[in-house]
């Protein structure tokens, strides 16, 4: 039994050495630099389009704060309410000479209770759009 455990430990150590060697090879190679550069590009690109949605329940009703990224400020904002689900879609079209780009992002959140879109009130404060659903209109 002891012989079998020694072999198992020896194999685990060899596997760790091989894994570390492969990681070192890829991290220090041109391929590793390419992967890291691509990951940094994706992360920095997504930072500009991230949005947050905060739901606050108060005695007067339901408040939903939606942070709109600066990249979408001139675009289209579509809010759709279905029962207990809020769907927010941000869209922006940009035209440069002979080419056009279209960026779109959708977020969906489940609300604490059912609301009706026709009761929705909206307001703006800098980069935050606030939706309000009065309590007396959904009960």
Curated annotation (Swiss-Prot):
Report which superkingdom the organism of origin falls in: Bacteria
Question: What is the protein name for this chain?
Answer: Uncharacterized protein YpqA
Kindly state which keywords UniProt assigns to this record, in alphabetical order.
Answer: Signal
The species is Bacillus subtilis (strain 168)
Recorded hits in InterPro entries, A to Z, give: A-crystallin/Hsp20_dom, HSP20-like_chaperone
The residues forming the signal peptide are 1-32
Q: Record's CDD domains?
A: ACD_sHsps_p23-like
User: PROSITE patterns this protein is in?
Assistant: SHSP
* Domain annotation sHSP: ranges: 44-139
Q: Which family does it belong to?
A: Belongs to the small heat shock protein (HSP20) family.
């Amino acid at each position: 039994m002891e012989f079998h455990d020694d072999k198992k430990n020896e194999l685990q150590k060899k596997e760790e050495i091989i894994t570390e060697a492969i990681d070192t090879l890829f991290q220090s190679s041109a391929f590793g630099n390419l992967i890291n550069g691509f990951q940094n590009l994706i992360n920095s690109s997504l930072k500009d389009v991230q949005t947050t949605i905060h739901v606050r329940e108060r005695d007067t009703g339901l408040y939903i704060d939606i942070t709109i990224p600066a990249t979408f400020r001139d675009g289209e904002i579509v809010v759709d309410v279905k029962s207990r689900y809020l769907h927010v879609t941000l869209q922006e079209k940009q035209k440069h000479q002979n080419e056009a780009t279209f960026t779109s992002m959708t977020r969906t959140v489940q609300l604490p209770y059912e609301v009706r879109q026709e009761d929705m009130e909206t307001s703006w404060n800098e980069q935050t759009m606030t939706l309000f659903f009065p309590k007396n209109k959904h009960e």
